[in-house]
Amino acid sequence: MLKRSLRGKSLLLKRFATRFRSLFTHVVVPKPLRTFGRHALATLAVLAVAGLAARPAAAEELAKNLFGAKQLPAVAAPQSIGFYSKGCFAGGVAIPLNGPKWEVMRPSRNRRWGHPTMIALIEKLSRDAAADGWPGLLVGDISQPRGGPMLTGHASHQIGLDADIWLTPMPDRKLSLEQRENMSATLLVDEKTHLVKDALWAPAHTRLLKRAASYAEVERILVNPGIKKKLCDTVKGDRGWLRKVRPFWGHDYHFHIRIGCQPGSPKCKAQENTAPGDGCDQSLAWWFTEEPWRPNKNPDRPKARDLMTMASLPAACQAVLDGPDPASAEAVTYYGDGVPVAAAPVLTKAPSPARASASGAAALPATANAYAETPEIGIPLPRPRPGG
């Protein structure tokens, strides 16, 4: 194979040199320059062959374009592959655009997909937070249908285990699609002082973050450093949950929930554990020095997503990218962790216990839905698009 490749390149070099010489057949070249010319021709030919060899790599499609073009998840057992900022996931499900205590924002982005555990947790948080006095969740970006690098925005959110929740409570009216696309979020942090705007902060914000941190699945909650400081300054009594709340750039209008690698995802790369303590120490004080806010010395440096090709991602992500579509988005929308993800065609009503059992889930009452209490069951798997 190697010899054949070398012979091919040699033949290409000879053809190039012959064609290049033909351009100068009618030009009289002084004798001292002829030897130099032969060397120059050979050099040009080698460079041309090298350029041709490098061209496929340079022209390889960016992974963000490939994953960003997918409108539906890959039908498979739920599995996160790679790291939060370099990976993909299969078997994703969508959170419904509307729930009893949540609404999805910016729906045109098609980023309401995640690992079933992530989606179930968001729905659970919406119910628990409502019991704590939070009117309802405005759900931001979760992941693309198959994860992977995004066309815009996040570096992470690639393996279905990250989700953004706005720090603006859900209004007491249903938002139109236009409002969800254009409604501005409330910025809670002053960009000059990096401190929370006291007039906008309420104890309900603290309760919401504490509730999110209370779940065993949650490993990190990313917030603006100003919000972390506000919590450090005001939380009394139990402060153990503050360990999960980590300061990071941005996150001034939403918080970022990150859950750990889930069972059935052997190729998922876990993040390091958070440091012991409540995080209200020198590591937080650093955020209120000049260093974190200095201008970027190389603002034109490409972002990772603008360089990542499929070769940059775990090899298993190619199979995820090529995996079969489900019948529809509705067929893989997660209506509460008590209702199976629809199997095959679109469901117009909750499945009967017999159908639920046939799909691999435990038997459920036919009336179970996102508006009812949800029993603990296994996660059923969606089936491929019929005929596909």
Mark where each language-model region is.
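Extended, low-complexity, intrinsically disordered C-terminal regulatory tails
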Residues: 62-75, 121-152, 222-244
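Sec/Tat signal peptide C-region and signal peptidase I cleavage site
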Residues: 53-59
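Active-site acidic/histidine clusters and adjacent loop/turn architecture
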Residues: 75-140, 201-211, 215-218
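Acidic/His-rich structured neighborhood in mature extracellular/periplasmic domains
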Residues: 131, 144-198, 257
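Bacterial N-terminal signal peptides
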Residues: 42-51
